[in-house]
């Protein structure tokens, strides 16, 4: 793959997540009954950051859960016979809550669909929102994000890589081109 561009640096990521945090509280009319669920892998630290921002400006803690969607994916045969199943940890009852699913990139919509299936198996939320740092387009399913850090129109030959300090050692969003594309 060939590096093309930096789409967001650390301060830009922070500002986007801070804005998303405000938009979430505004849409929910406060923090009552609100909870965040980060999708493995990079959605988890993003969800925790959004929760910290909400706690900063609202003075109230918002619970955060962790969701593994591996067994809900529709491409298991394409990713190998031994998928790596990680922990799902949602330390609160979903029933009646406004849940914000948090992921790094929205592309085809298949990850979000799998996350919705997994969540609904765990309870019956009052409302489910989707928050993403980057929406790159190219939907294959009728899914859209409610909260978006940055819309980045891409070609199918391009790859958006989100790096987060907690996983990758730095905060940065990059655009890459697949070789031979």
From Swiss-Prot:
What is the catalytic activity of this protein? UMP + diphosphate = 5-phospho-alpha-D-ribose 1-diphosphate + uracil
CDD domains xref list: PRTases_typeI
The encoding gene:
pyrR
Disulfide bridge map: none
Name the chain's protein: Bifunctional protein PyrR
Q: Which family does it belong to?
A: Belongs to the purine/pyrimidine phosphoribosyltransferase family. PyrR subfamily.
- The protein's organism comes out as Thermus thermophilus (strain ATCC 27634 / DSM 579 / HB8)
Q: What keywords tag this UniProt record? A: Glycosyltransferase, Repressor, RNA-binding, Transcription, Transcription regulation, Transcription termination, Transferase
HAMAP family xref list: PyrR
